[in-house]
């Protein structure tokens, strides 16, 4: 795994089946960050929030839930996304603007944020450098196999590691759609270079996939 990152995934009661549904990625120091997002004109509250915050070029945590997408939820949905970041930042003792939010699941239903607030202390308590599998389980929706991969390589004579975690097996059409993908690395790169590499990789992979022909 990539050094400097910790992960966790727990059950907060958002899913009806009682499975893990709340995850956290935490960087021990502020990390350089880049991101790409759905091109759908209708964007969920967490997407809109992250598009604003990622412009700073740094991030230290990502809190993500499954079971509810917090999409088409209006002003209340945006406040809920902001609250998720606020509660996480307070418990981690980091700036609120350094926390990104992601949600996946049912569209158009209010998010049970009180359950998330209650679960955040346990979510942070269980952070572990080897906890990426728990994170992968926590972001699962309708499929049955957690998606985690790690690779090592050399760049200019310097060793590096990359770890990726993703969710999604349906409702995928080029340009991201409903899937989530988080990539962590110890490569020392500025946000502009990270964005360039991310776009190039996505164009050759994620943006060529169509499943169900649905971009919702």
Question: Which stretches of residues belong to each language-model region?
Answer:
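Glycine-rich anion/phosphate-binding loops
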Residues: 40-46, 74-83
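N-terminal glycine-rich anion-binding loops that anchor highly charged ligand groups
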Residues: 16-26, 54-62, 214-216
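Glycine-rich, mobile lid/loop segments that gate access to catalytic sites or pores
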Residues: 82, 87-206, 216
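Glycine- and acidic-rich phosphate- and metal-coordinating loops
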Residues: 60-67, 98-104
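Glycine-rich oxoanion-binding loops at beta->alpha junctions
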Residues: 37-55, 141-155
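A short, flexible beta-alpha/helix-coil linker loop
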Residues: 31, 68-71
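N-terminal amphipathic/basic leader segments beginning at the initiator methionine
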Residues: 1-42
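Short beta-strand/turn micro-motifs at beta-sheet edges
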Residues: 51-52, 169-172, 210-212
């Amino acid at each position: 795994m990539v050094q400097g990152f910790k992960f966790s995934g727990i059950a907060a009661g958002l899913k009806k089946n009682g499975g893990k549904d709340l995850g956290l990625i935490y960087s021990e120091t502020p990390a350089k960050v880049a991101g790409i997002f759905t091109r759908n004109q209708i964007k969920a509250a967490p997407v809109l929030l992250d598009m604003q915050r990622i412009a700073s070029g740094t991030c230290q945590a990502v809190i993500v839930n499954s079971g509810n997408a917090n999409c088409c939820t209006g002003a209340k949905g945006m406040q809920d996304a902001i609250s998720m970041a606020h509660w996480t930042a307070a418990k981690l003792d980091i700036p609120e603007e350094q926390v990104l939010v992601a949600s996946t699941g049912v569209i158009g239903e209010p998010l049970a944020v009180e359950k998330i607030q209650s679960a955040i202390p346990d979510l942070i308590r269980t952070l572990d450098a080897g906890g990426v599998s728990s994170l992968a389980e926590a972001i699962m929706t309708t499929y049955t196999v957690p998606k985690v991969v790690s690779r090592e390589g050399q760049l200019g004579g310097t060793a590096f590691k990359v770890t990726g975690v993703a969710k999604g097996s349906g409702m995928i059409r080029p340009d991201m759609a409903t899937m989530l993908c988080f990539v962590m690395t110890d490569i020392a790169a500025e946000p502009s270079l990270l964005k360039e590499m991310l776009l190039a990789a996505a164009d050759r992979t994620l943006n060529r996939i169509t499943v169900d022909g649905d971009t919702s």
